[in-house]
Each structure stands twice: as structure tokens, then as C-alpha cells.
């Protein structure tokens, strides 16, 4: 098989690992009621189990910067293998859990281990494809991630239906992880040792993890009362997070080894792409969590039917990812990000006007009509999907190739932080607004009361008020998501243009495939698209920059 074929197999195997990690990011969304029943939490206290979701995301975020940098030192293949093994261990802990504490611990282990899968695969794509053509490849990897979002909720329902208990969702991960490890072993390139391997900034990674962890804890309010958005411990804990963040930046300023080496980094487009990724992540999680809750709380649907409402969004998301990667190679990352987030913002504005009759409502477009719920969710999914590949590509083009591992991790960290904010901050604020709306409706009903009502009439009126308060709360949340998307679109204007990227040089090492056997050079017909780290060229040629800046050869790396 040609080296080009090996390259495609490698990225396919990496995408499979990404899919496995992505499934468990979203799988608990549709089985959370079953989990609540087992751990003894009432259905009207759903905010108490958000650590099951945030624990996974926090582990993902906290570990990812270190794992991204570690992949630059130890190689992509090793980190993916370690991630899959740890993921299997975390799945066993989660499946054996009998209380909320152990369940959250298992989810944190899962998230920490799976933190390697997506960023390292994205970095692998950056290693093997040129800056000019990698956007579509990154879009494909992003589509694998979003396929996890598509399959995850339905996957959970299917396994619970098949095995009659939610633990099966996590037991199934063990053989799947083993299969993926075997495939990765024979598919991904092994990195040869170099004289001076990259060092890992452990202190910086720990400080960043502490800052993020304290932020999540400070935003988590298990008992919203309509008077305080944050819990009683919120402000002190957030102050501690701020101190940890300041310590992180101070350390990064003086440390010899840093999570992101500033040399060669174009910070304006780099930070803009990360901030836009954060906005996209917040909007994504708002949709995944609140659409299903809208179905249960407002439309009165059961868990399975409410989960199926997400299908419109989840199908459009990977389609948008593929289209976005294709478009970015032709019109540039900046324009695609701007268009995608503005489309998503428009969709959220439409969703914010949903009523209790949304299933019957239709958009009147003159010559024809479209169902409101289906159309609005598809618009949001398409818009958020469009930006997945371009945001990653823009971030990687703003840093030297030696930083691709940590830069890929930074993209996903930013997105996951946004997801955490979406479920923690907007969720707490949403329940705060719910209690405010409920109090307002109750006061209005008391003022309008005429003759005394029977107990049944009072209960019916109260149920109506609760439903109206839920509609108003979700309207507020989705409108906030629209604002977040507009902010992300404006930030997208600051990312790199179509032809702006850090100058790339040849890599300092030549990876090999499978069991370490050397790869034959590309055939002459493949030479124009061959990653140069796989070519047997003289060292003096590899160390020289290209004479023509426009001549982008795939896989060129900045010299260390």
C-alpha cells in the first residue's frame, strides 16, 4: 500500500478513537434520569447531577493541555494508546458506581483519559497534511467528533433498552477501547526518538487545571432559589480560580518550558480563534442539554421522545462540519467562521420564540411552509458545524508546527470550557430566571384571582404557571446563546486570513508506521502531496526553508 494510503488509514483510525471518546461526552444526556433514580435524586432536582456531565468535561479540559504537549514529546501513537487504556479504566469505575460521588470520579477519569484522543488526532492531521489542504481533513476529524454527538444520545437509549440498565453504556466501552487500541497500534505512525525531546510543563498544566476546576465548582449551584445566581461558596471559590489563573500566567512568563512557546506564535489570530471556539462550545452545550429538557418540561414528552428532538440538530452538525472544512479551503477560515456563527445566532433567536405549541407551529415562507422545530434546530446545527474545521485550522496556522499538539489541545480546551460555561453558568442563571418568572406569574395570578378556586383548580393553574415559566426560562437561555454566537462571530473577524500562516519547515524526526518499519518514499505521482517527514531526503535539504513562501509542502514543521 502507498504511503498516501497509510496516511489516510492513520487518520481514519485516529478518528475512530475520537468517536469513542465523543460518544461518552454526550451519552449521559439521555440516560441521566435512569442514573438519578439509581443514586436517589428526585427528578425535579436535575441540577444536582450536572457534575456527571461537568466532571467528564473538567477531566477532559484539565488533562488536555498536558496531554497535547506530551504528544509533542512522546509521539501521537503512544498518547492515543494511553488515553484509550485510561478511558477503559474510567468506564469500569463508572459502571461499578453505586453513589453520585463514585460516579463523578469515574467520569473524571474517563474525561481525563479521553482528553488525549481528539487533540492528538488533530495534531496528527496537521503533521501529515499541509496548511493549505488540512482544513478539509480537520473537518473530517471534527465530523467524527460530532458523529459522537449525533450517536451519543441515541446510543445511550439503545443500550439501556437492550440491556435494561444504564451501566451497560459504560461496560461496552471496555471491548471497544481494546479494539481501538489494536487498530491504532497497526495504523498510526510511531515516532522515532530524538536527541532532545520536548519537555512537558507540568506546573503550568496543574495551575491551569486548578483554575478551571475552581471555576466550575464556583459556578455550580445545586439549589437555585431565584435570589442568587451563584451558590454561597461561589464568590470565594471563583476568587481562588482567579488567583490560580494569575499564578498560571505568572509561571508561564518565567518558566523555561511552557504549555505554549510564544516564539513564532501569532497571538491575535490564535487567541481570537480560541475565544470563538469557546463561544461555539457554550452554544453547543446549551442546545444539547436544554432542547431535551424543553421537550420534557414544556412539551410533556417522555425521556426517549424528548431525546429524539435533538436528532434535527445532531444530523445537521456533522453535515455542517464537512461543508465548513470544504468551504474553508476555498474562501478561507475567517469568512466561514463569521457566516457559521451568524447562522447559528439566527437559529437561536428563532428557538427563543418557541411556545408550548411549537410542534404544530410552521414558518410561513410564502410559497411553502416549514416546521418550526425541525427548521430552527437544523439551522443551529448547520451553523455550529460550519465552524468546527475552520477554527481548528486557523489556530494551527497561527503557531509553529512544533506546537501543533498543544495548539490542537487548546482549541478543544476552549470549546470544552465553553461547554462548561454553557451548562454551569447559563444553567444556574436559567434556573434563577425560572424562579423569578414563576414568582412574577404567581403574583399576577393572585392579583387577578376572583372567586375562590378548588384544590384541583389551584393545582391546574399552578401547573400552567410552571409550564409558562419554563417557556420563558428557555427563551432567555436560547437568546443568551444567540448573543454568545454573535460575540464569537465578531471574534472570528480577528483570525488569520486565507493565506496567512506561520512559516513551516521540515520536521526534526521521521515517523514510521505500524511496528516501526520504514515507509517507502512516495511514488512520483504522489510527490506533490507527500508529507516531507515521510520522504528520505538529505538533512541539509530538510533543514532549509522553502524558497517560495507560497509553495506549501505537506507536513513541513518549524525547526525546533
UniProtKB/Swiss-Prot annotation:
Disulfide bonds: none annotated. Residues 362-371 are annotated as: Beta-hairpin. It is a multi-pass membrane protein. SUPFAM superfamilies: MFS general substrate transporter. Residues 519-560 are annotated as: Disordered. Its main location: membrane. The record marks 24 as: Protonation/deprotonation site. The record marks 415 as: Forms salt bridge with Gln-157, probably closes bottom of cavity. It comes from the Bacteria. GO terms for cellular component: plasma membrane. The record marks 146 as: Forms salt bridge with Arg-426, probably closes bottom of cavity. Induction: Part of the lrpG-MSMEG_3069/MSMEI_2992 operon. The chain crosses the membrane at residues 16-36, 48-68, 78-98, 108-128, 143-163, 168-188, 200-220, 229-249, 269-289, 307-327, 336-356, 368-388, 411-431, 477-497. It is found in: Cell inner membrane. Keywords: Antibiotic resistance, Cell inner membrane, Cell membrane, Lipid transport, Lipid-binding, Membrane, Transmembrane, Transmembrane helix, Transport. Changing residue 72 to N: Does not complement a deletion of this operon for antibiotic resistance. GO terms for biological process: lipid transport; response to antibiotic. Disruption phenotype: Double deletions of lprG-MSMEG_3069/MSMEI_2992 operon are more sensitive to ethidium bromide; restoration of wild-type growth is conferred by the M.tuberculosis operon. Cells display abnormal colony morphology and are defective for sliding motility under carbon-limiting conditions. A double lprG-MSMEG_3069/MSMEI_2992 deletion strain is more sensitive to the antibiotics tetracyline, vancomycin, rifabutin and novobiocin, has a higher mean surface rigidity, and has a cell separation defect. Resistance to ethidium bromide is inhibited by reserpine. In association with lipoprotein LprG transports triacyglycerides (TAG) across the inner cell membrane into the periplasm; TAG probably regulates lipid metabolism and growth regulation and plays a structural role in the outer membrane. TAG (and maybe other lipids) enters the central cavity of the P55 transporter from within the cell inner membrane via clefts on the cytoplasmic face of P55 between TM5-TM8 and TM2-TM11. From there the lipid is probably transferred to the hydrophobic cavity of LprG. Belongs to the major facilitator superfamily. P55 (TC 2.A.1.3.34) family. Has a canonical major facilitator superfamily fold with two N- and C-terminal domains of 6 transmembrane helices (TM 1-6 and 7-12) and two other transmembrane helices between the domains (TMA and TMB) that form a hairpin. Between TM9-TM10 is a periplasmic beta-hairpin that extends along the membrane plane, TM11 and TM12 helices extend into the periplasm. Asp-24 is a possible protonation/deprotonation site. This is Triacylglyceride transporter MSMEG_3069/MSMEI_2992. The lineage of its organism: Bacteria, Bacillati, Actinomycetota, Actinomycetes, Mycobacteriales.
